[in-house]
Amino acid sequence: MKIGIIGAMEPEVAHLIAAMTNATSQTIAGIEFIAGTLAGKDVVVTRSGIGKVAASIATTLLIEKYAPDAVINTGSAGGFVDTLAIGDIVISSEVRHHDVDVTAFGYEIGQMAQQPAAFIPAAHLVEAANKAIAQLGEVKAIEGLICTGDSFICDPVRTQAMLKNFPTMAACEMEGAAIAQVCHQFGVPFVVIRSLSDNANNDSPVDFDSYIVKAGYHSALMVMLLLEQLK
């Protein structure tokens, strides 16, 4: 079994790369792909860069060049659930674009034309993530809707507008739905694992800078524990 792991930023993949053995690297289109062993599994880890286009390019290259059996998106996110604190984790129950609107043609808000409204992660990956929760210690983890858009959300007015469109949203970030859409088209199972770096409010820029390393570590820890659960 080979697992592809994608994070957007260095703090989101650094702990994973440091824990790998037998690592080899190649760079394609300016994106570094590091293949090796992690938690007893063959993995390929890459830092995609920020945003949906960067994530789509990296995911396509990962699938085409390495043919992973599954893809895990790891990293940070802004939180939308009062019961979660910075550093806690959201496991995707579904993933949607929050900044897509082609409702004029009969699609749901957030649904890209000719695509499903929601991208559903692989059940066996979600199950493995849930089994790993018990080993997280004080870090809390839940399943929930993760939404994606090409914006860093730090405006309470925009936050409320997003919640009006997606009232069950647990977290938002900038890559997950793009990765999920590419996986959907290639028929590759996926899951998104995100640790909260901020709470999508006025303090988000300060919180993000302060807590991105913590969020990256917690998300990476969750990914490694998930890998241990996979058979």
From Swiss-Prot:
GO cellular component: cytosol
Top-level lineage group: Bacteria
Coiled-coil ranges from the UniProt annotation: none
Gene Ontology biological process terms in this record: L-methionine salvage from methylthioadenosine; L-methionine salvage from S-adenosylmethionine; nucleoside catabolic process
GO molecular function: adenosylhomocysteine nucleosidase activity; methylthioadenosine nucleosidase activity
Enzyme class label: hydrolase
SUPFAM superfamilies per record: Purine and uridine phosphorylases
Gene3D superfamilies on file: Nucleoside phosphorylase domain (3.40.50.1580)
Annotated positions binding substrate: G78, I153, M174, E175
InterPro entries given in the database record: MTA_SAH_Nsdase, Nucleoside_phosphorylase_d, Nucleoside_phosphorylase_sf
Keyword tRNA-binding: no
Sorted UniProt keywords: Amino-acid biosynthesis, Hydrolase, Methionine biosynthesis
Pathway(s) the chain acts in: Amino-acid biosynthesis; L-methionine biosynthesis via salvage pathway; S-methyl-5-thio-alpha-D-ribose 1-phosphate from S-methyl-5'-thioadenosine (hydrolase route): step 1/2
Catalytic activity: S-adenosyl-L-homocysteine + H2O = S-(5-deoxy-D-ribos-5-yl)-L-homocysteine + adenine; S-methyl-5'-thioadenosine + H2O = 5-(methylsulfanyl)-D-ribose + adenine; 5'-deoxyadenosine + H2O = 5-deoxy-D-ribose + adenine
Segments crossing the lipid bilayer: none
Enzyme Commission identifier(s): 3.2.2.9
Active site: E12, D198
Cited function: Catalyzes the irreversible cleavage of the glycosidic bond in both 5'-methylthioadenosine (MTA) and S-adenosylhomocysteine (SAH/AdoHcy) to adenine and the corresponding thioribose, 5'-methylthioribose and S-ribosylhomocysteine, respectively. Also cleaves 5'-deoxyadenosine, a toxic by-product of radical S-adenosylmethionine (SAM) enzymes, into 5-deoxyribose and adenine.
Similarity comment: Belongs to the PNP/UDP phosphorylase family. MtnN subfamily.
Protein name: 5'-methylthioadenosine/S-adenosylhomocysteine nucleosidase
